[in-house]
From Swiss-Prot:
SUPFAM superfamilies: MCP/YpsA-like
Family as reported in the entry's similarity comment: Belongs to the UPF0398 family.
Gene3D superfamilies in the cross-refs: 3.40.50.450
Name this protein carries in UniProt: UPF0398 protein lwe1908
InterPro entries per UniProt: YspA
UniProt-listed Pfam families: YpsA
HAMAP family: UPF0398
């Protein structure tokens, strides 16, 4: 597997309103624990669309892994131009910080937001151009990742597309593991 998409809940869907909230530490550690074995097995690219929450934290994790000398690259494929246009200043800064980590950046539709079909185009393009996906998504708590999940699940059923969901139980396991380490 050479490329994997990482997506999941937006931070506010998890009740997290600051990029550096305590909960983010656990989310990022969980992602790191899932990405490192894949990188060690040959993963070269992590693909995100630059949305708030799980995706930007994943971008930060890739940056941290690069600093630890892992050979991994980050691509940000935004669904449309000026995705962060309506975000508050703190979130715009967060997105621009993650953008500096990216090895590749492009817009799937080279125009501003027009309608929700641009999100469907994003999902389809990313799934069609990756070998798999890791979602921080719990089937018991629907949210915005459901649309990507449904499409990725179809890809998995039709091919050898890799699909891994990190649910709230997996996150809780990391919280407990990290707290026992103290």
């Amino acid at each position: 597997m050479k490329s994997i998409a990482v997506t999941g809940y937006k931070n506010f869907e998890l009740g997290i309103f600051k990029k550096d909230a305590d909960e983010a530490i656990y989310i990022k550690e969980t992602m790191k624990r899932h990405l490192v074995p894949l990188i060690e097995d040959g993963l070269e690219w992590v693909i995100i669309s630059g949305q708030l929450g799980i995706e930007l934290w994943a971008g930060e994790v890739v940056g941290e892994l690069k600093k630890e000398a892992y050979a991994i690259k980050l691509a940000i494929l935004e669904p449309f131009e000026n995705q962060s246009g309506n975000w508050n200043e703190a979130n715009k800064i967060w997105a621009s910080e993650v953008l500096t980590i990216a090895d590749y950046h492009a817009f799937i539709t080279k125009r501003p937001y027009e309608n929700p079909s641009q999100f469907a185009a994003r999902d389809g393009f990313i799934i069609d151009n990756t070998d798999g996906a890791i979602l921080v998504y719990d089937l018991e708590k629907e949210g915005s990742p459901k649309f990507f999940y449904d499409r990725a699940k179809l890809a998995k059923e039709r091919s050898d597309y890799y699909l891994e969901c990190i649910d709230f139980y997996a996150l809780q396991d990391v919280v407990e593991d990290m707290n026992q380490a103290f």
